Amino acid sequence: MFEKIAIIGGSGNVGSHIAFLGAMRHIAKEILLFSNDIPRCKGVGLDISQAAAIFDIPILIKGCNSYEEIAESEVVIITAGFPRTPNMTRNDLLLKNASIIQEISSNVARIAPQSLLIVVSNPLDAMCLVAKQWSKFEKERVIGMAGILDSARLTYESKVMLGDFNKHIQSYVIGSHSDDMLPLLRHCLCEGKVFTDIFTPKMQEELIKETKGGGAKIVNYYQKGSAYFAPASGVIKILEAISTLNEEILVCSVFTEGEYGIKDIYLGLPIKLGKKGVEHIVELPLNQQEQEMLNISTQGIKEQVEILKDNKLLY
């Protein structure tokens, strides 16, 4: 259990659901909700506090709009930013959200210099690099939540296709948090059997299509905003892995230094987490086609990085 965590963007859909799930699972003794919309932020904090009281969970949840109050937070979760709307690509969000992440990261480094940073804002992989550079934190302490979500969508779609929600499934979707994500069907398991032995080639194509379209489908249903229950759950999964040292392999956006032949960008890869953040990146054996697809997956991120450099949001 953490002593204190802070959620920047705590009044938004993702931030408030992280707080609610975190309270219900008693992830911390104190959860701080930071937002410019202080009335809503305080309302969310009070509402969740009353929910926690129903289950007699001893937790302090409060809203604030001063960075000074995030001092001594062990983890700071960044959900702030503009959400995707119908027909909006992640690139459309790039410059809009990068300036927000720049400001937040600089303030977190000033007020909570020992914290871990978990980034949820999109475009995820590029925002992680912005957060790392402007916080000046070690690469292990800046983690992006996306691969857990993409992998969960593959797990869900495979259960739908099998018509059996009782199956134990382990899925890995690596690469960028975009349409270029790479579901590693050869490494995904259902009751110990690999997906490529269970699903026909046509079924595999359908699984990949549905997984990649999972987020956009929710955006189209909601019309205003994007997914928040599942992303919030992904953050809690990271927090629990850090606090319990459960050794579970999770796909998160992490800084690369040659792993999988990729350097100097954030990318969704399998990792193990510990008290100090990323302990190590797990390198699954890829065949030539998978490696080529992973390389393609990095191109969009690299293009975003160049755009951010041109606009002085990265250096």
Swiss-Prot record:
GO terms for biological process: lactate metabolic process; tricarboxylic acid cycle. It is an enzyme of class 1 (oxidoreductase). GO terms for molecular function: L-lactate dehydrogenase activity; L-malate dehydrogenase (NAD+) activity. Substrate binds at residues 84, 90, 122, 153. SUPFAM superfamilies: LDH C-terminal domain-like, NAD(P)-binding Rossmann-fold domains. Its EC number is 1.1.1.37. InterPro entries: L-lactate/malate_DH, Lactate/malate_DH_C, Lactate/malate_DH_N, Lactate_DH/Glyco_Ohase_4_C, Malate_DH_type3, NAD(P)-bd_dom_sf. The keyword Ubl conjugation does not apply. It catalyses: (S)-malate + NAD(+) = oxaloacetate + NADH + H(+). NAD(+) binds at residues 9-15, 97, 120-122. Keywords: NAD, Oxidoreductase, Tricarboxylic acid cycle. The active site is at 177 (proton acceptor). PANTHER family: L-2-HYDROXYCARBOXYLATE DEHYDROGENASE (NAD(P)(+)), L-LACTATE DEHYDROGENASE. Catalyzes the reversible oxidation of malate to oxaloacetate. Belongs to the LDH/MDH superfamily. This is Malate dehydrogenase. The lineage of its organism: Bacteria, Pseudomonadati, Campylobacterota, Epsilonproteobacteria, Campylobacterales. The gene is mdh.
